[in-house]
From Swiss-Prot:
Modification N6-acetyllysine occurs at: 123, 137
Name of the protein in question: Superoxide dismutase [Cu-Zn]
Bound cofactor: record note: Binds 1 copper ion per subunit.
InterPro entries (alphabetical): SOD-like_Cu/Zn_dom_sf (IPR036423), SOD_Cu/Zn_/chaperone (IPR024134), SOD_Cu/Zn_BS (IPR018152), SOD_Cu_Zn_dom (IPR001424)
Cofactor(s) listed: Cu cation; Zn(2+)
One of the GO biological process terms: removal of superoxide radicals
Pfam families: Sod_Cu
Length: 154
Protein backbone atom coordinates (compact mmCIF):
# COMPACT_ATOMS: atom_id res chain seq x y z
CA UNK A 1 0.00 0.00 0.00
CA UNK A 2 1.35 3.40 -0.98
CA UNK A 3 2.28 5.91 1.71
CA UNK A 4 1.07 9.47 1.12
CA UNK A 5 1.75 12.86 2.67
CA UNK A 6 0.91 16.48 1.98
CA UNK A 7 2.40 19.87 2.82
CA UNK A 8 0.67 23.27 2.62
CA UNK A 9 3.30 25.99 2.16
CA UNK A 10 2.64 29.47 3.55
CA UNK A 11 4.83 32.44 4.37
CA UNK A 12 4.66 36.05 5.52
CA UNK A 13 4.43 37.25 1.92
CA UNK A 14 2.62 36.11 -1.24
CA UNK A 15 4.39 32.75 -1.60
CA UNK A 16 2.15 29.73 -1.07
CA UNK A 17 1.65 26.23 -2.43
CA UNK A 18 0.75 22.59 -1.91
CA UNK A 19 3.06 19.60 -2.32
CA UNK A 20 1.85 15.97 -2.38
CA UNK A 21 4.22 13.10 -1.61
CA UNK A 22 3.74 9.43 -2.53
CA UNK A 23 5.93 6.40 -1.87
CA UNK A 24 4.75 3.11 -3.39
CA UNK A 25 6.82 0.92 -1.07
CA UNK A 26 9.13 1.32 1.91
CA UNK A 27 12.65 2.02 0.68
CA UNK A 28 11.36 3.08 -2.75
CA UNK A 29 11.56 6.57 -4.25
CA UNK A 30 9.23 9.35 -3.14
CA UNK A 31 7.36 11.27 -5.86
CA UNK A 32 6.62 14.95 -5.16
CA UNK A 33 3.93 16.77 -7.14
CA UNK A 34 2.34 20.14 -6.62
CA UNK A 35 2.79 23.86 -7.12
CA UNK A 36 4.22 26.96 -5.49
CA UNK A 37 2.97 30.45 -6.44
CA UNK A 38 4.07 34.01 -5.68
CA UNK A 39 7.76 33.43 -6.42
CA UNK A 40 10.11 35.60 -8.46
CA UNK A 41 11.06 34.08 -11.83
CA UNK A 42 13.93 31.60 -11.62
CA UNK A 43 15.28 28.91 -9.31
CA UNK A 44 14.53 28.65 -5.60
CA UNK A 45 16.09 26.29 -3.06
CA UNK A 46 13.71 23.53 -1.94
CA UNK A 47 14.54 21.54 1.19
CA UNK A 48 13.16 19.44 4.01
CA UNK A 49 14.24 20.98 7.33
CA UNK A 50 14.78 19.02 10.54
CA UNK A 51 11.89 20.20 12.72
CA UNK A 52 8.14 20.49 12.27
CA UNK A 53 8.15 23.62 14.43
CA UNK A 54 6.67 26.65 12.67
CA UNK A 55 5.69 28.48 15.89
CA UNK A 56 7.78 31.51 14.87
CA UNK A 57 7.32 31.12 11.15
CA UNK A 58 9.83 29.26 9.02
CA UNK A 59 12.81 30.24 11.19
CA UNK A 60 12.06 27.62 13.87
CA UNK A 61 12.17 24.73 11.37
CA UNK A 62 15.89 24.28 12.08
CA UNK A 63 18.57 23.34 9.57
CA UNK A 64 18.25 20.99 6.60
CA UNK A 65 17.24 17.45 7.64
CA UNK A 66 20.67 15.81 7.89
CA UNK A 67 20.65 12.66 10.06
CA UNK A 68 23.83 11.35 8.38
CA UNK A 69 25.87 14.51 9.16
CA UNK A 70 26.89 15.10 5.54
CA UNK A 71 27.68 18.35 3.71
CA UNK A 72 25.05 20.09 1.60
CA UNK A 73 24.70 18.93 -2.00
CA UNK A 74 22.34 18.44 -4.88
CA UNK A 75 19.62 15.79 -5.11
CA UNK A 76 21.76 13.57 -7.36
CA UNK A 77 24.92 13.87 -5.23
CA UNK A 78 26.22 11.14 -2.94
CA UNK A 79 27.31 13.83 -0.45
CA UNK A 80 24.06 15.59 0.49
CA UNK A 81 21.68 16.16 3.35
CA UNK A 82 18.66 13.85 3.30
CA UNK A 83 16.52 16.99 2.93
CA UNK A 84 18.41 18.44 -0.06
CA UNK A 85 15.94 18.47 -2.95
CA UNK A 86 17.68 21.07 -5.11
CA UNK A 87 15.61 23.81 -6.74
CA UNK A 88 12.14 24.50 -8.03
CA UNK A 89 11.88 26.81 -11.04
CA UNK A 90 9.27 29.57 -11.20
CA UNK A 91 8.02 30.84 -14.56
CA UNK A 92 7.40 34.48 -15.54
CA UNK A 93 4.08 34.33 -13.63
CA UNK A 94 5.83 33.27 -10.42
CA UNK A 95 4.53 29.71 -10.48
CA UNK A 96 6.69 26.62 -10.00
CA UNK A 97 5.16 23.30 -10.95
CA UNK A 98 6.76 20.60 -8.82
CA UNK A 99 7.17 17.12 -10.29
CA UNK A 100 10.21 15.28 -8.98
CA UNK A 101 11.32 11.94 -7.61
CA UNK A 102 13.85 11.40 -4.81
CA UNK A 103 15.34 8.14 -3.57
CA UNK A 104 16.87 9.45 -0.32
CA UNK A 105 13.88 10.90 1.53
CA UNK A 106 11.23 8.51 2.83
CA UNK A 107 7.72 8.60 4.28
CA UNK A 108 8.65 5.97 6.89
CA UNK A 109 11.68 4.70 8.79
CA UNK A 110 14.81 6.54 9.89
CA UNK A 111 14.81 9.02 6.98
CA UNK A 112 11.10 9.80 7.29
CA UNK A 113 10.17 13.38 6.47
CA UNK A 114 6.73 13.10 8.14
CA UNK A 115 6.41 15.81 10.79
CA UNK A 116 9.32 17.82 9.39
CA UNK A 117 9.10 21.15 7.53
CA UNK A 118 9.31 21.72 3.77
CA UNK A 119 10.84 25.13 2.91
CA UNK A 120 11.09 27.11 -0.32
CA UNK A 121 13.89 29.70 -0.30
CA UNK A 122 14.46 33.16 -1.78
CA UNK A 123 17.46 32.27 -3.96
CA UNK A 124 18.83 29.49 -6.11
CA UNK A 125 20.48 26.60 -4.25
CA UNK A 126 24.07 26.32 -5.52
CA UNK A 127 24.00 22.58 -4.60
CA UNK A 128 27.05 22.90 -2.35
CA UNK A 129 29.29 24.10 -5.18
CA UNK A 130 29.48 27.80 -4.23
CA UNK A 131 33.04 27.65 -2.93
CA UNK A 132 32.36 28.90 0.60
CA UNK A 133 31.38 27.43 3.97
CA UNK A 134 27.75 28.57 3.75
CA UNK A 135 27.43 26.68 0.46
CA UNK A 136 28.29 23.42 2.24
CA UNK A 137 25.53 24.08 4.81
CA UNK A 138 22.67 25.80 2.97
CA UNK A 139 23.60 26.12 -0.70
CA UNK A 140 23.46 29.92 -0.24
CA UNK A 141 19.70 29.68 -0.86
CA UNK A 142 18.86 32.73 1.23
CA UNK A 143 15.82 33.48 3.34
CA UNK A 144 12.83 31.21 3.84
CA UNK A 145 9.87 32.44 1.79
CA UNK A 146 7.29 29.81 2.73
CA UNK A 147 7.10 26.59 4.69
CA UNK A 148 4.77 23.94 6.03
CA UNK A 149 4.81 20.76 8.07
CA UNK A 150 4.64 17.52 6.10
CA UNK A 151 1.70 15.47 7.34
CA UNK A 152 0.26 12.02 6.65
CA UNK A 153 -2.41 12.02 3.93
CA UNK A 154 -5.17 9.48 3.18
Amino acid sequence: MALKAVCVLKGDGPVHGVIHFEQQQEGGPVVLKGFIEGLTKGDHGFHVHEFGDNTQGCTTAGAHFNPLSKKHGGPKDEERHVGDLGNVTADENGKADVDMKDSVISLSGKHSIIGRTMVVHEKQDDLGKGGNEESTKTGNAGSRLACGVIGIAP
